[in-house]
Protein backbone atom coordinates (compact mmCIF):
# COMPACT_ATOMS: atom_id res chain seq x y z
CA UNK A 1 0.00 0.00 0.00
CA UNK A 2 1.06 3.66 -0.35
CA UNK A 3 3.29 4.95 2.44
CA UNK A 4 0.67 7.43 3.68
CA UNK A 5 -2.02 4.75 4.14
CA UNK A 6 -2.58 3.31 7.61
CA UNK A 7 -2.45 -0.49 7.67
CA UNK A 8 -4.48 -2.20 10.38
CA UNK A 9 -3.79 -5.77 11.38
CA UNK A 10 -7.22 -7.42 11.24
CA UNK A 11 -6.10 -10.74 12.71
CA UNK A 12 -8.77 -12.01 15.09
CA UNK A 13 -11.03 -9.02 14.46
CA UNK A 14 -14.55 -8.90 13.05
CA UNK A 15 -14.94 -6.85 9.87
CA UNK A 16 -18.29 -5.63 8.55
CA UNK A 17 -19.24 -3.52 5.53
CA UNK A 18 -19.86 0.15 6.12
CA UNK A 19 -23.28 0.96 7.57
CA UNK A 20 -25.85 2.95 5.57
CA UNK A 21 -28.35 5.27 7.28
CA UNK A 22 -31.49 5.37 5.14
CA UNK A 23 -33.07 8.31 7.03
CA UNK A 24 -30.74 10.98 8.34
CA UNK A 25 -30.64 14.73 8.96
CA UNK A 26 -26.89 14.93 9.55
CA UNK A 27 -24.86 17.66 7.84
CA UNK A 28 -28.02 19.71 7.30
CA UNK A 29 -29.24 22.19 9.90
CA UNK A 30 -32.15 23.69 7.92
CA UNK A 31 -34.30 20.68 7.14
CA UNK A 32 -37.88 22.02 7.26
CA UNK A 33 -39.20 24.49 4.71
CA UNK A 34 -42.53 24.40 6.47
CA UNK A 35 -44.03 27.67 5.29
CA UNK A 36 -46.32 25.90 2.83
CA UNK A 37 -47.68 22.39 2.36
CA UNK A 38 -45.73 21.59 -0.82
CA UNK A 39 -42.04 22.44 -1.20
CA UNK A 40 -40.88 19.83 -3.73
CA UNK A 41 -38.56 22.36 -5.34
CA UNK A 42 -36.17 22.77 -2.39
CA UNK A 43 -33.03 20.62 -2.19
CA UNK A 44 -31.12 19.39 0.85
CA UNK A 45 -27.94 19.26 -1.23
CA UNK A 46 -27.95 23.07 -1.37
CA UNK A 47 -27.48 23.35 2.41
CA UNK A 48 -25.11 20.47 3.17
CA UNK A 49 -22.56 21.35 5.84
CA UNK A 50 -19.45 19.23 5.35
CA UNK A 51 -17.99 20.61 8.60
CA UNK A 52 -20.73 19.08 10.74
CA UNK A 53 -18.93 17.18 13.52
CA UNK A 54 -21.66 14.54 13.26
CA UNK A 55 -19.96 13.23 10.11
CA UNK A 56 -16.78 12.52 12.07
CA UNK A 57 -18.67 10.83 14.89
CA UNK A 58 -20.75 8.70 12.54
CA UNK A 59 -17.63 7.53 10.71
CA UNK A 60 -16.20 6.47 14.07
CA UNK A 61 -19.29 4.32 14.58
CA UNK A 62 -18.98 2.59 11.21
CA UNK A 63 -21.43 4.66 9.14
CA UNK A 64 -20.16 5.33 5.62
CA UNK A 65 -23.20 6.56 3.69
CA UNK A 66 -26.43 8.39 4.55
CA UNK A 67 -29.69 9.44 2.91
CA UNK A 68 -30.14 13.06 4.03
CA UNK A 69 -33.83 13.91 4.03
CA UNK A 70 -35.95 17.02 4.30
CA UNK A 71 -37.95 17.25 7.51
CA UNK A 72 -41.56 16.13 7.99
CA UNK A 73 -43.25 19.49 8.56
CA UNK A 74 -45.18 19.43 5.29
CA UNK A 75 -47.05 16.92 3.16
CA UNK A 76 -44.63 17.11 0.24
CA UNK A 77 -41.23 18.22 1.42
CA UNK A 78 -37.94 18.74 -0.36
CA UNK A 79 -35.52 16.65 -2.37
CA UNK A 80 -33.01 14.38 -0.63
CA UNK A 81 -29.25 14.03 -0.93
CA UNK A 82 -27.40 10.72 -0.62
CA UNK A 83 -23.89 11.33 0.67
CA UNK A 84 -20.68 9.44 1.34
CA UNK A 85 -19.30 10.46 4.71
CA UNK A 86 -16.00 12.11 3.86
CA UNK A 87 -14.66 14.13 6.77
CA UNK A 88 -12.76 17.16 5.51
CA UNK A 89 -14.30 17.10 2.03
CA UNK A 90 -16.29 19.90 0.41
CA UNK A 91 -20.11 19.73 0.33
CA UNK A 92 -20.11 18.79 -3.37
CA UNK A 93 -17.61 15.99 -2.70
CA UNK A 94 -20.03 14.39 -0.23
CA UNK A 95 -22.71 13.78 -2.87
CA UNK A 96 -23.08 10.24 -4.21
CA UNK A 97 -23.99 10.75 -7.86
CA UNK A 98 -25.17 7.19 -8.57
CA UNK A 99 -28.01 7.29 -6.06
CA UNK A 100 -31.64 7.26 -7.18
CA UNK A 101 -33.19 10.67 -6.60
CA UNK A 102 -35.63 10.92 -3.71
CA UNK A 103 -38.06 13.26 -1.99
CA UNK A 104 -39.59 13.46 1.48
CA UNK A 105 -43.33 13.09 2.06
CA UNK A 106 -45.06 13.14 5.44
CA UNK A 107 -48.49 12.27 6.81
CA UNK A 108 -50.41 12.69 10.04
CA UNK A 109 -49.58 14.72 13.12
CA UNK A 110 -46.63 16.72 11.80
CA UNK A 111 -48.20 17.99 8.61
CA UNK A 112 -51.59 18.77 10.15
CA UNK A 113 -49.73 20.63 12.91
CA UNK A 114 -51.10 18.71 15.88
CA UNK A 115 -50.09 20.23 19.24
CA UNK A 116 -48.33 23.16 17.59
CA UNK A 117 -50.50 25.66 19.45
CA UNK A 118 -53.26 27.91 18.13
CA UNK A 119 -50.81 30.57 16.92
CA UNK A 120 -49.09 28.09 14.62
CA UNK A 121 -52.04 26.27 13.06
CA UNK A 122 -52.94 28.59 10.22
CA UNK A 123 -51.67 26.46 7.33
CA UNK A 124 -53.78 24.02 5.33
CA UNK A 125 -54.17 21.08 5.93
CA UNK A 126 -55.31 20.67 9.53
CA UNK A 127 -56.81 17.19 9.11
CA UNK A 128 -55.91 13.87 7.50
CA UNK A 129 -58.66 14.56 4.96
CA UNK A 130 -56.78 17.68 3.93
CA UNK A 131 -53.50 15.80 3.65
CA UNK A 132 -55.02 13.49 1.05
CA UNK A 133 -56.46 16.40 -0.88
CA UNK A 134 -53.08 18.15 -0.92
CA UNK A 135 -51.59 15.05 -2.53
CA UNK A 136 -54.36 14.67 -5.09
CA UNK A 137 -54.30 18.34 -6.04
CA UNK A 138 -50.51 18.27 -6.41
CA UNK A 139 -50.40 15.21 -8.64
CA UNK A 140 -53.36 16.41 -10.72
CA UNK A 141 -51.36 19.56 -11.44
CA UNK A 142 -48.25 17.47 -12.14
CA UNK A 143 -50.12 15.33 -14.69
CA UNK A 144 -51.30 18.46 -16.53
CA UNK A 145 -47.77 19.89 -16.45
CA UNK A 146 -46.41 16.60 -17.78
CA UNK A 147 -48.91 16.67 -20.68
CA UNK A 148 -47.96 20.23 -21.64
CA UNK A 149 -44.25 19.45 -21.84
CA UNK A 150 -44.85 16.12 -23.54
CA UNK A 151 -46.84 17.88 -26.26
CA UNK A 152 -44.16 20.52 -26.66
CA UNK A 153 -41.30 18.03 -26.84
CA UNK A 154 -43.08 15.85 -29.42
CA UNK A 155 -43.62 18.73 -31.84
CA UNK A 156 -41.64 21.84 -30.87
CA UNK A 157 -42.07 23.37 -34.34
CA UNK A 158 -45.68 24.18 -33.61
CA UNK A 159 -44.45 26.31 -30.72
CA UNK A 160 -42.17 28.55 -32.81
CA UNK A 161 -44.46 31.51 -32.53
CA UNK A 162 -45.58 30.66 -29.03
CA UNK A 163 -43.91 30.73 -25.65
CA UNK A 164 -42.95 27.20 -24.45
CA UNK A 165 -44.60 25.93 -21.27
CA UNK A 166 -43.34 27.78 -18.24
CA UNK A 167 -40.92 25.75 -16.12
CA UNK A 168 -42.11 24.96 -12.62
CA UNK A 169 -39.44 23.39 -10.40
CA UNK A 170 -42.01 22.12 -7.92
CA UNK A 171 -44.02 20.31 -10.58
CA UNK A 172 -40.87 19.03 -12.30
CA UNK A 173 -40.00 17.10 -9.15
CA UNK A 174 -43.50 15.62 -9.00
CA UNK A 175 -43.34 14.62 -12.67
CA UNK A 176 -40.10 12.80 -11.90
CA UNK A 177 -42.09 10.79 -9.33
CA UNK A 178 -44.76 9.99 -11.92
CA UNK A 179 -42.08 8.85 -14.37
CA UNK A 180 -40.28 6.67 -11.82
CA UNK A 181 -37.18 8.86 -11.67
CA UNK A 182 -37.60 9.98 -8.05
CA UNK A 183 -38.49 7.81 -5.03
CA UNK A 184 -40.81 8.85 -2.22
CA UNK A 185 -39.60 8.48 1.38
CA UNK A 186 -42.72 8.98 3.50
CA UNK A 187 -42.96 9.69 7.24
CA UNK A 188 -46.23 8.24 8.58
CA UNK A 189 -48.00 7.29 11.80
CA UNK A 190 -51.14 5.20 11.21
CA UNK A 191 -52.35 2.37 9.01
CA UNK A 192 -55.28 4.36 7.65
CA UNK A 193 -53.08 7.15 6.33
CA UNK A 194 -50.62 4.66 4.83
CA UNK A 195 -53.55 3.05 3.00
CA UNK A 196 -54.63 6.52 1.87
CA UNK A 197 -51.23 7.19 0.29
CA UNK A 198 -51.34 3.74 -1.31
CA UNK A 199 -54.70 4.57 -2.91
CA UNK A 200 -53.38 7.90 -4.19
CA UNK A 201 -50.29 6.20 -5.61
CA UNK A 202 -52.44 3.63 -7.39
CA UNK A 203 -54.72 6.32 -8.83
CA UNK A 204 -51.79 8.30 -10.24
CA UNK A 205 -49.54 5.35 -11.10
CA UNK A 206 -46.51 6.04 -8.95
CA UNK A 207 -44.74 3.94 -6.33
CA UNK A 208 -43.56 4.72 -2.80
CA UNK A 209 -39.96 3.82 -1.99
CA UNK A 210 -40.08 3.77 1.81
Regions found by a protein language model. Give the residues of each.
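Histidine-rich, glycine-flanked metal-binding segment
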Residues: 1-16
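Divalent metal-coordination and catalytic microenvironments
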Residues: 12, 23, 58, 197
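Protease-associated
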Residues: 16-17, 29, 176
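Histidine-centered catalytic micro-motifs
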Residues: 20-28
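Feature captures the catalytic cores and cofactor-binding loops of soluble hydro-lyases/lyases
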Residues: 29, 34-38, 196-199
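Proteins synthesized as precursors that undergo proteolytic processing into mature forms
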Residues: 33-56, 60
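Polyanionic/metal-chelating signatures
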Residues: 59-207
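Extracellular/periplasmic bilobed ligand-binding domains
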Residues: 210
Amino acid sequence: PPKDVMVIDGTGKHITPGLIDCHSHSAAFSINEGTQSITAEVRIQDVLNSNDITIYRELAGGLTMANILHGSANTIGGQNAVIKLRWGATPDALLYSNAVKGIKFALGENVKQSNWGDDNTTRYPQTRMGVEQILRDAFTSAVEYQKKWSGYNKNPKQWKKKVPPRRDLELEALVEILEGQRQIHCHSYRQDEILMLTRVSEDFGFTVGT
